[in-house]
Amino acid sequence: MILQVLHMAREMKLLKLGLVALDGTKLHANASRHKALSHGYATRLEAQLRAEVDELLRLAETADQKERHLGADLPAELKRRQDRLEKIAAAKIVIEERDRERLAQEQAEYEKMVARREAKRARTGKSPRGRDPKPPEEGPRPTDQVNLTDPDSRIMPTSGGGFDQAYNAQATVAERSMLVITAHVTQAPNDVKQLVPVLEQLKALEPLLGRPDTLAADTGYCSASNVEAVETAGITPLIAAGRTRHHPHWSERFETPEETMEDTPIGRLKHRLKTLAGRAQYAKRKHIVEPVFGIIKRVMGFRQFSLRGLDLVEGEWDLVCLAWNVRRLAVLRGK
């Protein structure tokens, strides 16, 4: 449905992909963070419940247990603990599966870092600066947890401070029309791995909507591989390479960078962001995508998912973005 609305906007000459802005926003899951179970607590509780089950079984074998435990329904007490043990075992399996995925990712990153350091050592004949990277640790950490109400949701930091059970909803918005071009939901609290999936979505939309000229995103999306991926897609990246100062000296706004620059994707990006044109274009980012999130939350009242599970939440976010696009299209037609 989103595609149909975008196609309609394109046919009405209300949508043109020039500058697009990508960002993410945390939305509450339909689950309480107090229903989360950590691996450390699950292990301790599992041991406690097993000990209680053994004790209840011994009591059941004692001839005078009714006299010593008046009112105690041993079969019910046993079943209650065994049910909890089954839930704990299932939760630990989920945590351990996630840990294996985490370990595989960290191991791949570790091997890349080691390979880069070895290549530099072979090229220069000197040891690279800094300490050698540490290999990732195996096994779940005590703080690794799963939510028993919505296992797909994650504990995430919120913009107002603190943490909540949430999903990270992503959207790419076109500058002039402010229509949502791509939308997806992720379980990752940070955004750095969300740019490549967006590029894949934009690539699939090219036959219908064309290709954006420029993609703007904040520093959460910045990595050398991401910048290179945007360039490879034929799009100019405008991704903050670091946090900017809130109150720079006034003269910095009018400085022109030197012509020399590092001839790499990240080097070209840093040079571009120092130019007057680059800074002016990047400044548009927060006026493109952030108002969309603000209106969705404050005006449309969507702050929390009603459904549970990543697949269903994805569909719900698509529906919200569709509602925004229909609303926005009505405004554009009236201009």
Region spans (language model):
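Anion-binding and metal-coordination hotspots
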Residues: 1-335
